[in-house]
Design a protein with these regions (language model features):
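Phosphate/nucleotide-binding beta-alpha loop and adjacent structural elements of enzyme active sites
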Residues: 1-200
C-alpha cells in the first residue's frame, strides 16, 4: 500500500496532471523508502512529484537539492514547489565537470557531453553551498548516474539509499554501478526498470 501524499502538479502548459499516473512509480518508491533523516540529492526533478514527496517526508526541508536540466519545465517545477508548500532547493542545470548539451524527447530528456548552454555544477560545491551531506539519491535522469560514477565515485560511500530508473543503458553502465554499490555496502531491495538500493 502506497502512503498517501497529497499534491497538485501542473505541467509546463499549466495543465493539472494526474500524479498517480505521471511519474507515479517514482514518488511511490520515495514514499516507501525515504526516511525523515535523509538529506537528498534528486537528479531529474521534472515537474516535481518525487521532489514534493521527498520534501513532505524529510525533517529538514532545506536538506534537499533537486536538479533539473530542462529549461522547458523550470517554471512548472518552481510553481509546483510553491503551491505544495515545499522548501527543497532547485538547481536549474546539471551536475558535471564537463560542458553538456541537452536532447529533448518529451519525458526522456537527457544530457550528454558537448557544446551547450546548460549550467553545470560541481557536486561537492553544491554540498557546501546548501550545507548538506547527501545520504540519499533519487535519480530519474536518463542515464545521468554515469556522471557520478565517473567523476564523483566517492559519493556512493556516504549514501544509504539510492532510487533510480535504469534508463539510457548506452550512456550509463549499470553493471558498473551495481559493482560500485555492492562495494559500498548497498544491497538491492527492488529490481527492474525501477531499482532501490539500501545500505546493509
Amino acid at each position: 500500500m502506497v502512503p498517501e501524499i497529497n499534491m497538485v502538479i501542473k505541467n509546463e502548459y499549466g495543465q493539472v496532471i494526474d500524479h498517480n499516473i505521471v511519474e507515479a512509480h517514482e514518488w511511490h518508491l520515495v514514499a516507501h523508502y525515504v526516511k525523515p533523516h535523509h538529506q537528498i540529492l534528486e537528479l531529474g526533478a521534472r515537474y516535481g512529484s518525487a521532489s514534493i514527496a521527498c520534501n513532505k517526508i524529510i525533517n529538514d526541508k532545506t536538506k534537499q537539492v533537486s536538479i533539473e536540466p530542462d529549461p522547458n519545465v523550470w517554471a512548472a517545477l518552481e510553481e509546483n514547489k510553491m503551491v505544495n508548500e515545499c522548501e527543497f532547493n532547485i538547481i536549474k542545470g546539471a551536475i558535471s565537470k564537463n560542458k553538456l548539451k541537452i536532447h529533448n524527447h518529451a519525458y526522456a530528456t537527457y544530457t550528454e557531453e558537448g557544446e551547450g548552454d546548460i549550467p553545470v555544477y560541481d557536486l561537492w560545491d553544491l554540498q557546501n553551498r546548501f550545507d548538506v551531506k547527501f545520504n540519499a539519491i533519487v535519480a530519474d535522469c536518463e542515464g545521468c548516474l554515469a556522471e557520478l560514477m565517473n567523476n564523483y565515485p566517492e559519493i556512493f560511500s556516504q549514501i544509504e539509499l539510492l532510487i533510480y530508473e535504469m534508463d539510457q543503458p548506452a550512456i550509463c553502465d549499470y553493471s558498473k554501478l551495481t559493482s560500485i554499490l555492492a562495494a559500498n555496502g548497498l544491497r538491492c531491495v527492488e529490481a527492474g526498470f525501477h531499482n532501490v538500493y539500501v545500505k546493509q
